[in-house]
């Protein structure tokens, strides 16, 4: 009896040129990442005008189906949430709930200036969240007011590159050890009241410029006349 056949009864096939052209050598991690980045299912959280730009991707001009994007109506079937528009304090718990209902691994794209920093609504509104990353972790930011559809495609490509280089074991370990989102309390600054009757005592109000009446093409009602009418 041949000892070589006894130790290895099945002969090792020779790797020929024909075999190398038909066999793909990869790892389970790369195969898993390729399947995920080729079938990204987004959940749209549109609250403002930025969502209109994303809706333009559905048409044939941009054709976002080529990236494997399939919009879902349920967070339990989505692995990507795109926040487009202003997020208020009252909407923050609903957004966090939707994010928590998504299965792991999950990703977030912040679209537009209002989502990233609060935008123009954060200057004089105490109910606007100054950045959605205070509520949920953001993977890709898309600046703009609103960003163009090409910018959304660029964000999708960058997210796909990030997904392709990830190790699933490291991501799950990171999720298990640390919290992926945090909430920051918004502090209000006390400012003097602007809506008061003191503005009537300003010099420009007491004595308006002469050319103001001509520009308005109507007579000006001076505070003295108002006081006289009130006394009568």
UniProtKB/Swiss-Prot annotation:
It comes from Gloeobacter violaceus (strain ATCC 29082 / PCC 7421). It is an enzyme of class 7 (translocase). Belongs to the complex I 20 kDa subunit family. One of its GO terms (molecular function) is 4 iron, 4 sulfur cluster binding. The keyword Transport applies. NDH-1 can be composed of about 15 different subunits; different subcomplexes with different compositions have been identified which probably have different functions. NDH-1 shuttles electrons from an unknown electron donor, via FMN and iron-sulfur (Fe-S) centers, to quinones in the respiratory and/or the photosynthetic chain. The immediate electron acceptor for the enzyme in this species is believed to be plastoquinone. Couples the redox reaction to proton translocation, and thus conserves the redox energy in a proton gradient. Cyanobacterial NDH-1 also plays a role in inorganic carbon-concentration. It is found in: Cell inner membrane. This is NAD(P)H-quinone oxidoreductase subunit K 1. PANTHER family: NADH DEHYDROGENASE, NADH DEHYDROGENASE [UBIQUINONE] IRON-SULFUR PROTEIN 7, MITOCHONDRIAL. Pfam families: Oxidored_q6. It catalyses: a plastoquinone + NADH + (n+1) H(+)(in) = a plastoquinol + NAD(+) + n H(+)(out); a plastoquinone + NADPH + (n+1) H(+)(in) = a plastoquinol + NADP(+) + n H(+)(out).
